[in-house]
UniProtKB/Swiss-Prot annotation:
Name of protein: Acyltransferase clz18
Molecular-function annotations in GO: acyltransferase activity, transferring groups other than amino-acyl groups
Transmembrane segment boundaries: 21-41, 70-90, 134-154, 253-273, 346-366, 391-411, 424-444
Main location: membrane
Subcellular location: Membrane
Pathway info: Secondary metabolite biosynthesis
Stored PANTHER family: ACETYLTRANSFERASE, PUTATIVE (AFU_ORTHOLOGUE AFUA_4G08520)-RELATED
Annotated gene: clz18
Similarity remark: Belongs to the acyltransferase 3 family.
Record organism: Cochliobolus lunatus (Filamentous fungus)
EC number(s) given by UniProt: 2.3.1.-
Purpose: Acyltransferase; part of the gene cluster that mediates the biosynthesis of squalestatin S1 (SQS1, also known as zaragozic acid A), a heavily oxidized fungal polyketide that offers potent cholesterol lowering activity by targeting squalene synthase (SS). SQS1 is composed of a 2,8-dioxobicyclic[3.2.1]octane-3,4,5-tricarboxyclic acid core that is connected to two lipophilic polyketide arms.
Amino acid sequence: MIHKPIPNSKPLTAYIDGLRGLLSIIIFNAHLTPVIILGYDKVSRSQVSTSPRNVLDIPLVASCVNNWVLFTIPILKLVYSASPAVCLFFAISGYVMSLKWVRYMNHRSQTSEINSARIFTDFGSSIFRRTLRLSLLAMASMIVPFALMKTGFFDRTVVQQHGLTKLERGMRFWLEQWEQFPARHESWWEQTCDLVQNCARIFTVFMQRRDEAFSPRYNPVLWTIKADLRASLALTVTHLALLGTKRSSRLQILAALAVLGVAVGSLECPLFWAGWIIAEIHHAAEQTPLAQGKGTGQPRQKTNTAGMDTFGKTVVLALGCYVASYPTWKPEKAPMFNTFHMMTPGLIVPPRTWHSLGAVLVLYSLRDVPLARRICESSVAQFLGTHSFAIYLIHFCLVISFGPDLFSWVWSRTGHENLQSLAVGFGITYSILFMAVLLTAAIFRRFIESPVNKCVDSLYRSASVRKEA
């Protein structure tokens, strides 16, 4: 008896949702670095001193720096590296935003029976909802830090209280994150006005990241939301500009735009355009089996080429992970990346350029690597993907508010004198913080994100032009 294959009920882009969930946890891991340093410093000091100290005077930091090569192991480094994760987030956004457009263009080239007005209405609806949803949720994420700041629970001078001096950028270990938060004002009215001004920063998307007023200070991670909104506008304009072009011409123009964006120092726009290129490639690959099946009247048979394609994509995925692992700090001390320096002698390539290239390779290949795709489509990854945006928005405030004291409290009981006790204390504290972030993210999604999404949908329906009967 021949059994019919069980159809896969998951959407074709389900792995994208799971990948987003895993990336949100990677960023959570990355932001633990300064928290661990302060927690260890508090429990390891015999007496409190506010005299200027170098962060390298902390034994844990000095030990990590002396063994820096262990923290530059390719692929393993991705577990706690924020920059590659952010680059992949941007590429995914460009990919998802372009999928519908690519499908429309392909369908239009095959048939003229297309309701153009309906298509443009769908595009407009997507832009309206996405922009408003991101903006409202970003502003909502600043309310809790605002309350913690005003009530005195959170103190932006915690690093100065440890007596740690500010070092050059590469040696700060993200300890300057506390300084990015605003000062506490005397009255609630002044603090509220300051919050409103920071909320308004969400819409100033054309400012540069180096400008002091770019990032909303009540939640510094929101700089990526502003960059996302700016790149979304650039991508939408490009969608309209290339509406009447052939696929080959589109790919050439997009590649040129991406290279130009990298040359002028842009991070997010080249990644959005690269996401569009990958959407074009993936869609063309999906159409090839269908075209072959129609031509022969038979379903396409699997051949050895499928296995070779999987092997090739696995190699590309591994290469992408390797490139994305390029160290941000002291890359010359990472012997496993000497190949990069040999390939570009005398040329200084910013680490984020390598991270961007790695992110593009990962997004291009992951879909066709069965093991990687199954991981992203697993129930755990899908759950994290459902809450990924909430995790990203709320984790930073929780980590820097509770993290240092929690690490020091746990280490004071488990001990911190040897590697075993240090690891046990880290595992306990990490588990507590991780569960707290997941619980808070679930609450945020249930009571803030979902109502905001419904409100935006309702607002668009009430504002849209209705068809006449």
